[in-house]
C-alpha cells in the first residue's frame, strides 16, 4: 500500500495517480477541516499523556497536519508535546516504541558511524543529541532521552519555523546506571553500566567527528547530559561545529534576559546589583557565568547550594 503525508486532503486526481483509490474515505478535506477534526479528537482524550501519544502518532503519520495543529493551538499543546508530559513518555520509551524516529548510536556502533549517517538521505540543519543520563528531573533514563530530543525539535519547528524534514533527533547509547532499566527485559537500550572517563570521551569524539563529516554546517545541541560531562563536551568540541547546551546556555540566556529586563524597569544596572543564585547545577552555573560576564565583575554573582555558599575554600 502506498503512503501519503497529506491524508484526506490529497486531491482525487492525486489519489488516482498514486494508486490510492479506495484507500481512504471519499471526502477531500481542507487542511483547516483536518485540523479542526483532529483537535476535537485530541480534546476528547482522557489524560494529557493520552493526548501526547495521539500527537506523536500524528507527527509520524501526517507531519503537515501535526505542525499546523500545534501552531494553531501553541500555548495549549506545547506542554503536551514537551514538558511536563514528555517526561512520562521518556520513562516508558521502550514500552511505547513502535517505529524508529531519529538515530540511536550505541557504543557498539562506534566503527559504523559514517555508514549510519550516510544512510540519512536528507540534509540536516539541526541535531539535538542526548545520552539520557540526566533527563529533566528524572535521572538516568538511558535511551529514553530520545523523547526529549524529538520533543525539543518539534518545538523548534512548531514555534521557530525550522523545517522538520531537516532536523535529526540523536540518542547516544552508552549504557545506563539505572538499576531498574538494567533489570527490565523490555528495555531496548544497551543493558550495561555506562561507559565513562576516556572511553566515553573517545566515543563522543568519534560521534562528533562523523557528524562533522556528514553535515559540516549543522547546529548541534547537547540536551540532558550529566553535569560532569556537559561543560566538558562544550569545551571539547566548540571549535568543531556550531553547538550549544540548552541546559547551560539556553537557560542562562533566558534567565539573564529576565534579570536585565527587571533591572531596566527598576532603573538599576547589573554592575550595581548583587546576585545570589540558589542551585549550583548545570543551569545555575550557566546563569552565573553569563551574568558575571554581563556584569563585568564576577564577584557580584554568588552561588548557593545544599551545602551553603559556593566558595574556593569550601571542602566540597
Stretches with model-predicted labels:
Residues 1-242:
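N-terminal ligand-binding/catalytic initiation module
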Residues 240, 245-316:
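Glycine-rich phosphate/diphosphate-binding loop of Rossmann-like nucleotide-binding domains
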Amino acid at each position: 500500500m502506498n503512503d501519503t503525508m497529506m491524508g484526506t486532503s490529497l486531491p482525487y486526481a492525486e489519489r488516482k495517480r498514486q494508486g490510492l483509490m479506495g484507500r481512504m474515505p471519499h471526502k477531500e478535506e481542507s487542511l483547516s477541516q483536518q485540523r479542526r477534526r483532529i483537535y476535537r479528537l485530541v480534546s476528547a482524550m482522557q489524560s494529557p499523556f493520552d493526548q501526547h501519544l495521539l500527537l506523536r502518532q500524528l507527527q509520524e503519520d501526517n507531519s503537515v497536519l501535526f505542525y499546523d495543529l500545534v501552531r494553531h493551538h501553541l500555548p495549549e499543546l506545547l506542554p503536551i508535546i514537551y514538558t511536563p508530559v514528555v517526561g512520562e513518555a521518556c520513562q516508558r520509551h521502550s514500552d511505547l516504541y513502535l517505529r524508529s524516529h531519529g538515530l540511536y548510536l550505541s557504543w557498539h556502533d562506534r566503527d559504523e558511524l559514517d555508514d549510519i549517517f550516510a544512510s540519512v538521505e536528507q540534509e540536516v540543519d539541526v541535531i539535538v543529541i542526548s545520552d539520557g543520563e540526566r533527563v529533566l528531573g528524572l535521572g538516568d533514563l538511558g535511551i529514553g532521552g530520545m523523547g526529549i530530543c524529538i520533543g525539543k525539535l518539534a518545538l523548534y519547528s512548531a514555534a521557530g519555523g525550522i523545517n522538520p524534514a531537516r532536523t535529526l533527533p540523536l540518542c547516544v547509547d552508552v549504557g545506563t546506571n539505572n538499576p531498574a532499566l538494567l533489570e527490565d527485559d523490555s528495555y531496548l537500550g544497551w543493558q550495561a553500566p555506562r561507559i565513562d572517563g576516556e572511553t566515553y570521551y573517545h566515543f563522543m569524539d568519534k560521534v562528533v567527528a562523523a557528524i562533522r563529516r556528514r553535515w559540516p554546517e549543522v547546529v548541534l545541541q547537547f540536551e540532558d547530559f550529566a553535569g560532569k560531562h556537559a561543560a566538558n563536551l562544550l569545551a571539547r568540541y566548540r571549535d568543531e561545529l556550531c553547538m550549544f547546551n540548552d541546559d547551560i546556555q539556553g537557560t542562562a540566556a533566558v534567565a539573564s534576559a529576565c534579570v536585565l529586563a527587571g533591572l531596566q524597569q527598576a532603573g538599576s544596572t547589573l554592575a550595581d546589583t548583587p546576585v545570589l543564585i540558589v542551585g549550583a547545577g548545570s543551569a545555575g552555573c550557566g546563569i552565573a557565568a553569563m551574568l558575571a560576564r554581563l556584569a563585568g565583575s564576577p564577584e557580584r554573582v554568588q552561588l548557593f547550594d545544599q551545602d551553603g555558599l559556593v566558595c574556593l575554600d569550601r571542602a566540597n
